[in-house]
């Protein structure tokens, strides 16, 4: 394919006042690919709750505050329009569709990378955090690390899967839940949660209980959950006895779930979720609560000793899990629930997130 014409300037959305939800559309230079890099003309980018945490500086786990002028975003899909020196060795060609993930670059050499945990790379670069993100029309990516997008999978559908889809798929694998076993998805109607429900129920043969606000019930059940639990119907001052008893009653012999995936960023959800487990159960922590860190309120030593429960974390998937997630979508096993918006709408989207009103995902049309 002949090389397309590449402009000198591009549109991008920056965080103009980190600590708030304010964004601004600006004009930036189109970058030149370096050695082993490709230039990607992005057409779509998902908007993730992680972007919200980064732009508002409410993720206290991050080492540095976000700086004004940061281009956010880490769920970008587009076409390769230029190859840097050496990039052809990757097999990529002009016109290939690829995706840019949360971890935009991993070294491939450190101990985590060598163990297949490139999401924990010691030398990682995070798209949209001290690295230019995907809320722009052109971005650079390492030729060996961008994710191929399968033919037949629309770019807008692929975008949310590059973070949300990959993240929950990896967390489901870490839960070690087996086909036919019960799994609870906390935050089941959110951007991550509704994808976790689909992958669990339709891709892995798990029996799913979705937990979320009542307004999310239709989406959660449509995604494949057998049961839905409305958290607003239960008290919080009873040490979560009522809701945990109810969730357990939905499982085989009332023993509880084999696993829980906490997709929401709620400290209360973490305290509840640990109590949903049966003996030898596993809770996987995915959602990152904002502001000052808090311990899980129900994490008493006696609980771990008496029930042999396990708690683990899951950040993002590796490059192979990203490819596997795309294959799920290409086969129609999963489909993100999303709406499309223009770049100029990003501030309003973040306001929806701030108010807890957002269902599913939002994908930016970057044209």
Curated annotation (Swiss-Prot):
Q: Which reaction does it catalyse?
A: a primary alcohol + NAD(+) = an aldehyde + NADH + H(+); a secondary alcohol + NAD(+) = a ketone + NADH + H(+)
- Cofactor, how bound (note): Binds 2 Zn(2+) ions per subunit.
What EC numbers are recorded for this enzyme? 1.1.1.1
Keyword annotations of the record: Cytoplasm, Metal-binding, NAD, Oxidoreductase, Zinc
Among the GO biological process terms of this entry, one is: alcohol metabolic process
UniProt xrefs under Gene3D superfamilies: Medium-chain alcohol dehydrogenases, catalytic domain, NAD(P)-binding Rossmann-like Domain
Any one Gene Ontology cellular component term annotated for this protein: cytoplasm
Q: Where does Zn(2+) 2 bind?
A: 107, 110, 113, 121
What is stated as this protein's family in its record? Belongs to the zinc-containing alcohol dehydrogenase family.
What quaternary arrangement does the UniProt entry report? Answer: Homotetramer.
What is the recorded name of this protein?
A: Alcohol dehydrogenase 2
Provenance organism? Emericella nidulans (strain FGSC A4 / ATCC 38163 / CBS 112.46 / NRRL 194 / M139)
Taxon lineage: Eukaryota, Fungi, Dikarya, Ascomycota, Pezizomycotina
Gene that this sequence comes from? alcB
